[in-house]
Each structure stands twice: as C-alpha cells, then as structure tokens.
C-alpha cells in the first residue's frame, strides 16, 4: 500500500460523493497528446488531418475488407499507451525477429490523429483495426451502426493513470460551483466526458445539469483549452498533461479531479472489424499475445516509438519514461476483468454522456462489442492474478480525522429504510438495489477512500443513539465489502444526532435518519 501525504496546500485534493441513504419512517491525451474527435468528413487516405466544424453531405458505408488477407491494418494516434504495439512490431511494419514476427503475424500501423479519418477508413475497409478509448468507441457507435459496420473490442492496452483531469480556479471545489462558470473542454474529447460524467452523477436538478452541459465552451484541442485556462479566460478546464501539473504549481489553481483516482473512466483498446476478427481469430489472439509480451518493454525500450511517432522525435529516454507514468499497462488478468464487467458498465455511462451532449449512440453494441473469445485461448499462458502497479491508499488515523471536514465535490442522495432502532435494512433487496448504483460509482472511482457516516433522529444525545448510528454505517460498509470493495478503502463514523438537517419532531425528521457515504480522493 502506498502512503499518501495529506496537506491542505493544494497538493491534496479531496473528492467526495455523498450518498445519503435515508432511513424512512421505520428508521463519478484521456491523455494529453490525443486530438479531439472531429466532426465527420471524408477520409484523406490515411494521413493526419485537422478538425472541421462542417459535416459532409455523404457518409461512408461499410465496405468489404479482404478477409482472406490475415494482415492487420491498424491505425493509432500519438499516445504513449500504444507503445507495446509499436514495440511488438518494432516499427510501423512488422520487422524480422520482432515479437509479432515470432508469433507469425504481420501488422501495418498507420499514425492517424484524426478519429474521423480513422473511423471512415475502418468503415470503408481500408483499415481492419483502430485504437480508441471506450469513451470514443461509444461516441463512434452510432456512426458505425448507421454505416452497417459491426466491430469488436477484444483487448485493452492501458488505463489513463493521471494524464487526464479537471482543473479549476481556487474556490471552485464542487459540481454545484460549476453553475454559471466558464468551463472549457476539448470538443468531443475524452476530457469532455469527465465533466459530463460528474454532472450526470450529481444531485443537481435536470435544469442545472443541462445548463452546465449547454454552456461548456468548446475548443479544438486540449492544448488550446489548457492555454485558455492559464490565460485567465476560463474558470474550469477539462484537459490533460502537462496542464494538470501546471495547476499544482499555480497558487490560484488546483486539480479538482484526475484519472489517478479512476482507472476505468478512460481506457484504451483496439477495435477490430468483426468480419476480419471472425475470419482470423488466431491472428487476433496472437496480436493480443504480442501486446502482453511487449508490456515488459514499456519502460525500458524507447527507440521504436521515437522513430514512428513525431511527438517523441528528439525526446530523451528519461522524458519518454516519465510520460509512461500517465498510462498503466493492462495484461491478461486486467483484460479478463474489464471485458467481462468494467468495460460494458463504462460504455453505458459514456452512452449516457454522449446522448446528454446531443449525439446518437448504439447502446446495444455493448452486447457483442467486448468479446473475450480472442483472449481466453491465452488463459494457460498468463496468470489470472492482476499485475497492476496501483496500490490502495494507506491512511493513518490522524489523516483519517483530517479529511472528515473537506468540502464535497459531488453530492448524490438515495433513500433506503432501516428497521426502527436497529441497523437492519427494512427491505434488504430494495436497499441492495439502491446501493448497487453507488457500488458501480465506487468501482469506477477505484482510487478513493470511502467514508461512511451513520446518523439518527433524536432530540437529545445518548450513548445508545451514538452506537446505533455507528452500526448503521457499518451495515452499509459491509454491503460494499460484500460487493468486492476493498475494506482498506472504508472508514466508518457514527455521528449520532450531531448532523441533523431537520427538526426531530417535524415531517422532515426522516431526513435525519440517514447514512452519508463520501468518496474522498487524495492526490499526491
């Protein structure tokens, strides 16, 4: 477990989701190098191109790729998280003696920073594979459906591990604070989905949520967004590195949230045309195998990525290695878990977000998109134990006390009943269903400490009331643990009657009988 420093000097950010479980009458470039998603436009035969606000009069239709040819024609944008693929290939084409060559496959890699160009090429059959995030795949799902193209996403290469986030001026600490503020985002980017995710998960009114979404200021890319923030033109910016680091060095700015606290919100993977994958399952499996083998080279070999991605040209080994810290590699065990459960959940969240932004998505694609049939043949070769380098945060008792009063970034409330004067749920199945939404958020924000506070409705203090509130907090915590949440992430507190929000004899007294659940994220 890693020990975290806890201070109030801007290096530590506490992120809180409050889930008020109210006892009834009985008782939250994706990396800093990726460009934003451009509006649809005709492909420019595999070259990089800028964005445009004009949509074409015609859109590509799914063409037939040559499924007799087992060569993988793949597009990647410039991002360090794709490094294992470059390393396994030893360049843009498969080199003799490379990992892919030893596995008997050939891969042609095209560096395309424009997702519209790459997705058009995937649709027409010029490409049979492309690298995207779950966020972007959800964005493109409607386009693929309209074109009649079926795709699968059989492997993920990495999580964003701190390369993406939301920065704000001092004094802007909560989702409620976003109302009326100038919020800049790279248009149709993964960074934009971060703001929308928190807004959608909050207890703001629908009108307030829509106001924040509608008033976001759109920029062409994250660099423009970050520069506008530090030029004083914005109050809040969704962006990526190096602008997150700049915020920690600025006395009037701070990081509201970064992906160090949530691996799954932004994940990179490879999308294949289904017709190609079905025709060549062994090739897809070998491709996945090669990625896993090349993970060992992630922080030791830098010549291949430097030779094929312009952003790394002339960059030292030390600088590239430092950038590697913004992406955490995924192996067999991580892919098994993500494909089976995490990815579909995140995909649905991203569909919600894109729909709230006025885009058309294909929700049903999740039923076939995350297909593990190409991964499972490798089960005997790789361990099912995660090799993740992420470790739970370890807090001292003193640090736990310090974080109790930090302001909540995001508030979310739900209602569940306890049996009067007990810590038992009045309707367990109903309570579990309510808390499952929170468990989903907890799994997404997997780098956070969870503080559970029990409360009661009582005019006067009593030891028994204090004990009851603590037991109710523990009851909620036990359910989280039963759902797989690490108990090391949990803190339970009994407030007794010290945090009542209504007169104990009023019609609103039930509001006092609640359990508050806080997500607290501490950044180094």
Predicted regions and their residues:
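Short, glycine-/small- and polar/acidic-enriched structural segments
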Residues: 36-219, 235-241, 264
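Pocket-lining segment of extracytoplasmic ligand-binding domains
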Residues: 134-136, 144-145, 205, 209-313
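Periplasmic OmpA-like peptidoglycan-binding domain that tethers envelope proteins to the cell wall
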Residues: 428-429, 455-524
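Secondary-structure end/capping motifs
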Residues: 278-362
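Hydrophobic single-pass membrane-insertion segments
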Residues: 24-41
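N-terminal Sec-pathway targeting helices
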Residues: 4-19, 25
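Periplasmic peptidoglycan-binding/tethering modules of Gram-negative envelope proteins
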Residues: 361, 374-449, 522-524
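Extracytoplasmic/secreted proteins, especially bacterial periplasmic and envelope-associated proteins
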Residues: 80, 84-87, 113, 117, ...
């Amino acid at each position: 477990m890693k020990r975290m420093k806890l201070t109030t000097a801007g290096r530590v950010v506490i992120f809180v989701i409050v889930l008020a479980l109210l006892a009834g009458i009985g008782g939250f470039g994706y990396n800093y190098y990726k460009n934003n998603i451009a509006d649809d436009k005709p492909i420019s035969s595999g070259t990089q191109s800028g964005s445009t606000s004009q949509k074409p009069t015609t859109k590509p239709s799914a063409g037939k790729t040559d499924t007799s040819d087992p060569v993988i024609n793949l597009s990647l944008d410039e991002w360090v998280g794709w490094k294992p693929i470059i390393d396994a290939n030893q360049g843009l084409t498969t080199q003799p003696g490379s990992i892919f060559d030893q596995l008997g496959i050939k891969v042609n890699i095209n560096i395309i920073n424009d997702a519209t160009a790459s997705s058009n090429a995937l649709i027409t059959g010029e490409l049979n594979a492309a690298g995207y995030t779950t966020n972007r795949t959800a964005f493109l799902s409607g386009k693929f459906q309209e074109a009649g193209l079926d795709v699968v996403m059989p492997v993920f290469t990495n999580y964003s591990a701190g390369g993406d986030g939301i920065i704000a001026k001092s004094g802007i600490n909560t989702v409620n604070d976003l109302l009326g503020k100038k919020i800049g985002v790279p248009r149709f980017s993964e960074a934009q989905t971060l703001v929308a995710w928190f807004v959608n998960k909050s207890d703001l009114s629908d009108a307030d949520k829509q106001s924040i979404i509608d008033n976001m200021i759109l920029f062409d890319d994250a660099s423009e967004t970050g520069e506008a923030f530090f030029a004083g033109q914005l109050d809040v910016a969704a962006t990526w590195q190096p602008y997150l680091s700049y915020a920690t060095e600025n006395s009037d700015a701070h990081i509201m949230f970064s992906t160090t606290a949530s691996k799954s919100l932004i994940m990179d993977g490879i999308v294949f045309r289904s017709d190609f994958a079905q025709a060549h399952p062994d090739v897809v499996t070998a491709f996945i195998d090669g990625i896993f083998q090349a993970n060992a080279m992630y922080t030791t070999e830098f010549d291949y990525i430097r030779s094929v991605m312009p952003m790394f040209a002339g960059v030292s080994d030390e600088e590239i290695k430092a950038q590697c810290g913004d992406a955490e590699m995924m192996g067999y065990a991580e892919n098994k878990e993500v494909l089976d459960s995490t990815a579909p959940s995140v995909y649905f969240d991203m569909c919600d977000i894109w729909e709230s932004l006025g885009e058309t998505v294909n929700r049903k694609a999740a039923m076939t998109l995350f297909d593990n049939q190409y991964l499972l043949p490798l089960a005997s070769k790789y361990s099912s134990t995660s090799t993740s380098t992420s470790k739970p945060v370890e807090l001292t008792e003193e640090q736990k006390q310090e974080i109790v009063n930090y302001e909540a970034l995001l508030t979310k409330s739900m209602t569940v009943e306890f049996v009067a004067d007990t810590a038992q749920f009045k309707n367990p199945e109903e309570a579990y269903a309510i808390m499952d939404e929170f468990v989903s958020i907890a799994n997404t924000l997997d780098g956070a400490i969870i503080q559970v506070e029990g409360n009661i409705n009582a005019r006067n203090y009593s030891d028994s009331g204090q004990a009851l509130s603590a037991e109710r907090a523990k009851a909620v915590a036990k359910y989280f643990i039963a759902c797989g949440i690490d108990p090391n992430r949990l803190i339970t507190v009994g407030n007794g009657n010290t945090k009542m929000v209504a007169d104990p004899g009023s019609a609103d007294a039930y509001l006092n009988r609640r359990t508050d659940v806080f997500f607290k994220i501490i950044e180094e």
